[in-house]
């Protein structure tokens, strides 16, 4: 026995499916503007999200200055530039080795390549992938919501996601959270389109899990959550379970090689900063404290709360709307014993959200944008849950999210001044950078260009002083200690890529014993081919906040001088302090 249903992400296409398979949410077609939403929900989301993304792209080009990249951004952008530099049609394996040997998620830097190949070799060109990810993720959110509750909810969910504060700031930054969230959403969308893991979307589901796991190293923690969603969709269907196995094999085949090649460095980093002693440096508390912290972060990212205030009235509207929707579903069930078409899919997405929050709560490391892969699923789930609520409540909720979205865009595009009430209160880097140079403060934006110019010049001068000590064309090996946000091994690596020079930095853990630090003070090191070359030493001496491995930089500096290292160059820092460049006396 077969039945027919609408299986397409657009309307009007039907195909036979087994009676045990879940139908898509019913399609309703209205007239006028509502008819457009019903017939072409993805087109509406794509057009509006593209407009939002274009606005962010313009902001990136006009406001992201080279001296205003945080260390993670600088490192990721340097990776993208290095990927581009390694492209050689005569030696394609050089590109494979460069990408495959990258110790941080390579997917987003890889996706930046078309922009770097078509445009100038500028960090801002690499960042242009972020607005594209915004559009793709908005479509994926709409796709999930379409499967759960129909086209109108799809439009609402896609546009709410595209205008959230956390998404706006992630789009304007070159962090990897947006990439991880995009592929998490694409994976779930593919899962819901897979006819319970029986068609070709099954392979897309597995592929997107792999891409998520290679987008950001910590995102591998969300792979079990997406796998759990697959288990819920499969249910007791043996054919669906075979599809789940195939999706898993695709995921392992795609992500496995990169994880195996970099296994030691990836696991050492993840366990050290996720569950080791260093995790406590970025957050503490019991499991309950961590769950509350994550829920607060999610509230901030969705305009529903601030860190200390959960009294936002929209929370009540959301809760009452969802409750009225549940009442409506219960009423219909009592009447004719039917449940919503997207119920199994909704349970799958809900399971992924709960498992994702559990993964977040398993570590004390607060992280930045760790919650995005959860939020990207929570948005369509919440709006789908509210989609059958009372009409008046849905209108109020829609108006609230529209107002929040306009406000968010105004704030994030700097059309509205910074503030302390409704997020986003500042660009993601402003408050952090202001701890090192007050000119980066959100209330001193007129000084941003001058501040970034000073720090760009400082990074350039430090790296070029190093490069002058090395024969032209040779890699520049340096041990760098005293790292801080505005000048560090990653910012120097970015400058090296802009100068098209191979930079090989090492960062000693100065907190360790004198004996363990001594290996970073040997006069020589080796290049990638094992050849012995001179080691250079960079010491940043200042009174600013240091990175965790650099806390004992002054002890390390004294040890270096005692071991025969001599200062051969100095560069003053814009806010006080100095960068010393040293060579060992055996190499002078």
Where are the predicted features?
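Membrane-interface transmembrane helices that cradle and orient dolichyl/undecaprenyl
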Residues: 7, 147-152, 184-204, 212, ...
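Short helix- or helix-capping micro-motifs
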Residues: 52-53, 157-163, 189, 209-213
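Membrane-proximal lumenal/periplasmic loop motifs of glycosylation machinery
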Residues: 62-74, 87-109, 124, 485
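Short acidic/glycine- and proline-prone juxtamembrane loop motifs at membrane-interface regions
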Residues: 127-130, 166-180, 367-368
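Perimembrane helix-loop-helix junctions
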Residues: 193, 221-252, 328-337, 380, ...
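Signature aromatic-anchored transmembrane alpha helix within multi-pass, membrane-resident enzymes
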Residues: 207, 248-252, 386-430
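Hydrophobic, aromatic-rich transmembrane alpha-helices
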Residues: 231, 307-343, 354-355, 394-398, ...
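Membrane-lumen/periplasm interface segments of specific transmembrane helices
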Residues: 243-289, 293, 357, 362, ...
């Amino acid at each position: 026995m077969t039945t027919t249903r609408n299986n397409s992400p657009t309307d009007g296409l039907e195909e036979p499916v087994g009676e045990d398979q879940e139908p898509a949410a019913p399609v309703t077609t209205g007239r006028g503007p509502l008819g457009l939403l019903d017939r072409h929900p993805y087109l509406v989301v794509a057009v509006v999200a593209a407009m939002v993304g274009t606005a962010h792209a313009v902001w990136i080009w006009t406001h992201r200055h080279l001296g205003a990249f945080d260390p993670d951004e600088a490192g990721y952008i340097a990776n993208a530039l290095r990927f581009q530099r390694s492209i050689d049609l005569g030696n394609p394996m050089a590109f494979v080795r460069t990408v495959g040997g990258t110790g941080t998620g390579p997917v987003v830097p890889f996706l930046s390549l078309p922009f770097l190949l078509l445009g100038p070799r500028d960090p801002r060109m690499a960042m242009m992938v972020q607005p594209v990810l915004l559009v793709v993720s908005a479509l994926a959110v709409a796709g999930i919501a379409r499967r759960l509750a129909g086209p109108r909810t799809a439009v609402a969910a896609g546009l709410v996601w595209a205008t959230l504060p956390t998404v706006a700031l992630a789009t304007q930054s070159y962090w990897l959270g947006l990439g991880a969230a995009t592929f998490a959403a694409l994976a779930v969308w593919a899962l819901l389109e897979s006819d319970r893991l029986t068609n070709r979307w099954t392979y897309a589901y597995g592929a997107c899990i792999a891409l998520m796991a290679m987008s950001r190293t910590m995102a591998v923690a969300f792979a079990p959550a997406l796998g759990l969603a697959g288990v819920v969709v499969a249910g007791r269907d043996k054919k669906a379970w075979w599809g789940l196995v195939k999706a898993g094999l695709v995921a392992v085949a795609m992500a496995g090689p990169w994880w195996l090649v970099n296994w030691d460095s990836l696991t050492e980093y993840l366990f050290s900063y996720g569950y080791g002693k260093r995790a406590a440096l970025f957050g503490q508390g019991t499991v309950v404290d961590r769950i509350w912290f994550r829920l607060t972060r999610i509230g901030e990212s969705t305009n529903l709360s601030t860190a200390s205030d959960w009294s936002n009235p929209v929370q009540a509207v959301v809760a009452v709307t969802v409750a009225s929707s549940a009442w409506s579903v219960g009423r219909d069930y009592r009447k004719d014993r039917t449940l919503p078409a997207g119920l199994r899919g909704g349970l799958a997405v809900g399971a992924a959200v709960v498992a994702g929050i559990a993964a977040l709560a398993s570590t004390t490391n607060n992280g930045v944008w760790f919650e995005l892969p959860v939020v990207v699923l929570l948005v369509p789930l919440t709006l789908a849950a509210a989609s059958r609520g009372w009409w008046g409540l849905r209108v109020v909720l829609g108006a609230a999210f529209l107002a929040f979205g306009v406000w968010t865009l105004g704030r994030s595009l700097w059309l509205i001044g910074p503030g302390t009430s409704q997020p986003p209160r500042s660009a993601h880097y402003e408050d952090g950078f202001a701890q090192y140079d007050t000119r980066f403060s959100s209330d001193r934006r007129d000084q941003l260009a001058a501040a970034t110019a000073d720090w760009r010049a400082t990074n350039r001068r430090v790296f070029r002083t190093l490069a002058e000590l090395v024969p032209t064309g040779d890699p520049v090996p340096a041990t760098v200690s005293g790292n801080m946000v505005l000048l560090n091994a990653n910012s120097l690596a970015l400058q090296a890529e802009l100068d098209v020079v191979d930079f090989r930095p090492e960062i000693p853990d100065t907190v360790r014993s004198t004996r363990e630090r001594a290996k970073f003070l040997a006069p020589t090191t080796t290049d990638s081919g094992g050849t012995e070359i001179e080691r250079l030493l960079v010491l940043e001496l200042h009174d600013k906040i240091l990175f965790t491995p650099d806390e004992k930089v002054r002890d390390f500096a004294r040890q270096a001088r005692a071991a025969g290292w001599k200062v051969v160059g100095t560069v003053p820092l814009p806010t006080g302090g100095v960068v010393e460049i040293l060579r060992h006396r055996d190499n002078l």
